Design a protein with these regions (language model features):
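Class I SAM-dependent methyltransferase SAM/SAH-binding core
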Residues: 1-32
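A short SAM/SAH-binding and catalytic strip from SAM-dependent methyltransferases
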Residues: 30, 41-57
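Local beta-strand N-terminus motif with an aromatic residue
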Residues: 40-41, 67
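Short "lid" loop at the C-terminus of a central beta-strand within the Rossmann-like core
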Residues: 52, 75-80, 119-121
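A short glycine-rich, Lys/Arg-flanked "PGG" loop and its adjoining helix->strand segment in the class I
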Residues: 56-72
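Short, glycine-/aromatic-enriched active-site segment of Class I SAM-dependent methyltransferases
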Residues: 75-93
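Short alpha-helix
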Residues: 95-110, 114-116
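Conserved Class I S-adenosyl-L-methionine
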Residues: 114-184
Length: 184
């Protein structure tokens, strides 16, 4: 995974459940797939990592790296907070049907994949309004100075009852597509 935080969470969950046969690789799929340093594994997981670039080539490489199964996730519906921010800015937040294109591409490649929808509701914790703002700015398309002021004001109104420098918690909901297949 390109995200050190995601790897940290995976490792923590694996340790909690006594799972010791995971190899953690802190790189992008593009870096991983473009080198010969990764040998085939029983299972390959690609979560939110195939959003751009040559998808067919990346999927082919991932499929070659998997001996038994491949599991990939793609965001479908953004969180309610993201939708609120976009609505407040007067923008349209395009939901992401990329998984449909991936499914069709896999079929063209001769891979009979499965698709499961996963609704996720989790308690998110942020280190104050600045942390939430930084994550929104990272996910949003470019924000003008005016947009940044509007977003900060919105967040302060929404979470203002909490100390701006304290940990802010709220439920984040989203919908994901799990695209997976087993190898013959």
């Amino acid at each position: 995974d390109i995200s050190g935080e995601m790897l940290r969470l995976l490792k923590s969950n694996a340790e909690k459940h006594g799972i010791a046969n995971i190899r953690y690789i802190h790189r992008s799929w593009e870096e991983t797939c473009s080198t010969d340093t990764i040998e085939p594994h029983d299972v390959v997981v690609a979560s939110r990592s195939l959003m751009a670039g040559n998808l067919r080539e990346s999927i082919s490489r991932i499929d070659r790296l998997a001996r038994r199964a491949v599991y990939m996730t793609f965001p479908v519906v953004h969180s309610s907070l993201d939708r609120e921010v976009y609505r407040m800015l007067g923008r349209t937040l395009t939901e992401n049907p990329l998984y449909l294109s991936i499914y069709a591409m896999l079929f063209q490649m001769g891979i009979m994949a499965n698709v499961d929808m996963i609704r996720s509701v989790r308690t998110a914790q942020y280190n104050g309004i600045d942390d939430i703002f930084d994550r929104i700015r990272w996910r949003a398309d470019e924000l003008s100075d005016t947009d940044e002021i509007k977003v900060r004001k919105f967040l302060e109104e929404k979470f203002g009852e909490q100390n701006p420098s304290s940990v802010i918690t709220f439920n984040r909901d989203s919908l994901w597509a799990l695209v997976w297949w087993r190898k013959a």
